[in-house]
Amino acid sequence: MTRRRERRPKNTSRVFIYGAGKVGTSLARALRATGALVTLRAARKGLPRRIEADIVIVAVRDRDVRLVAESMRAAGIVPRRAVAVHVAGALDAEALAPLRGACAGVAQMHPMIAFASARRAPSLAKGHVRLQGDASAVRRARAVARRLGMVARELPGLDTIAYHAAAGLVANGAAALAAVGAELLVRGGVPRKVAPAMLGPLLRSVAENVASLGFPEALTGPVRRGDVAGLRKHLATLHAKLPEAVPLYLAAAAAQLPLARAIGDATEANLDAIAELLTKRA
């Protein structure tokens, strides 16, 4: 009796993810939720004997991407029909150049999302993905982004390092600002375990304002209002309770001034007074 070969549904993709860190694990979980057949392999286990996939995602540290590509090429394990992509923000598709000719194409597929924990994956829906590379690989990476509910962007001529620095400034800078803000809350009387829970929704509302309103309208607070007296009180309290945060506060307030001037809610005289206050306290 001849055994019939089981057919995959037409909309089912086979994905191999090499690297089971924060990004790799989060992508695996999200793709499985869409019905994709995902194999996740930790880099510490080394390369498998063979890979059966339509798309190979290399999710290792930036410095290891090219080495992994070279090793996969030498091992001959990437199917010729498959495409290979990496998720590094600071590297373009050329990091996977050793795999050209061994597969159907290579690309960068960087999700502009903050992956802080492998155990608690962030929401990917509506996040943006930067795609760059061979047309065949970009096409399949775009399909992956679509499955995840993400927005794919090719952005021709993009300065990759500037792009990555911008992402780091916002994602890492926001986390650092929140940590300083949490410490100030604690010194002001908020329980240490409560402070992050209070700041999370605040950050979420800022993110929503940035996405929906853009700049300069997303700015709120005393600089936008031209509240010189309020800023003086803030600085006095910071000097008393958390003096090491004063330079950070001054720098953040100075960065708000051009936005406040563009909005025009405050008088130029008040904004000039704020600029003078920040200069004197610096």
Residue ranges of model-derived segments:
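NAD(P)+-binding Rossmann beta1-loop-alpha1 motif at the extreme N-terminus of oxidoreductases
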Residues: 1-52
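Phosphate-coordination loops involved in phosphoryl transfer and adenosine-cofactor binding
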Residues: 11-14, 81, 126
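Internal alpha-helical scaffold of NAD(P)-dependent oxidoreductase catalytic cores
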Residues: 27, 99, 105, 120-212
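Rossmann-like NAD(P)(H) cofactor-binding subdomain of soluble oxidoreductases
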Residues: 45-120
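Interdomain hinge/lid region at the active-site interface
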Residues: 208-269
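Short, basic/aromatic-enriched C-terminal tail that caps enzymatic domains
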Residues: 266-282
